[in-house]
Amino acid sequence: TWLMKEFGKTYYEKTAYISFYNNQRMQAVFDTDFDIKRIIMNLNIESGVAITPENTLIVLDEIQNAPKALESLKYFCEEAPEYHVIAAGSLLGVALHEGISYPVGKVDLLDLYPFNFREFLCAMDEEGLESALETKDYNLIDNFADKYLFWLKNYYYTGGMPAVVDAFRLNKDYAEVRQIQSDIVRQYEGDFGKHIEAKVLPRIRMVWDSIPRQLAKENKKFFFGQIKKGARSSEFEIAIQWLLDCGL
């Protein structure tokens, strides 16, 4: 959400932001038909922004809650390419797995991931170290092995979630890092119940809770016995697939 808004602020005169989360009115707008002129009029009113071609970025957030809005991207592309639209969905992988129509060939798809190590170095204002990795000059890299090890250990501790990296960049406070990480994990867990059937929820939580135990083993093979004694794959395949579709 922040990234889309920042992109709009940087490259467009105006940004019209629409979220479909708990927004039945806007979901209904797209359920009616794919008349782009009518849709734009509704987006104007909802966002409070006068949408004009070329210089307004239309942001459709939590689009997995409005399947027809996702499908409408095909018609924006074919019938009204002068309107610039960007969309995001936190559980879009789950939505697509459940059969929501996807506008194949009409959109550019971008998956977002946590920072990798090189991006982490740049965030820590260590562009020199990052550039040296690009050269693959291992004599040069070896000269600064102590610096790479220092930052690699910090990267392993902080991970790559942007809020965590930003806090560490500003304060270098390991306790603050751990608190933010814990908050993110709790937010994930709190989100589970909003998007899945109640009967599947306990199994998803059990798989999720078993992940640290799975990773702590020397043998990295996934053992269902780490979830619960006597567990079988058939009991948890839906839960595992759901977490995979979420990108978790």
Where are the regions a protein language model picked out?
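Short glycine-rich substrate-engagement loop in P-loop NTPases that contacts/grips substrate
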Residues: N22-T56
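Hydrophobic positions on the alpha1 helix immediately C-terminal to the Walker A/P-loop
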Residues: L3-F7
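Amphipathic alpha-helical segments of the small helical/lid subdomains adjacent to P-loop NTPase cores
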Residues: D111-A163
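Structural recognition of the conserved hydrophobic beta-strand(s) that form the central parallel beta-sheet
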Residues: V59, H84-S90, D111, F120
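Conserved catalytic/switch belt of AAA+ P-loop NTPases
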Residues: L70-A87, L91-G93
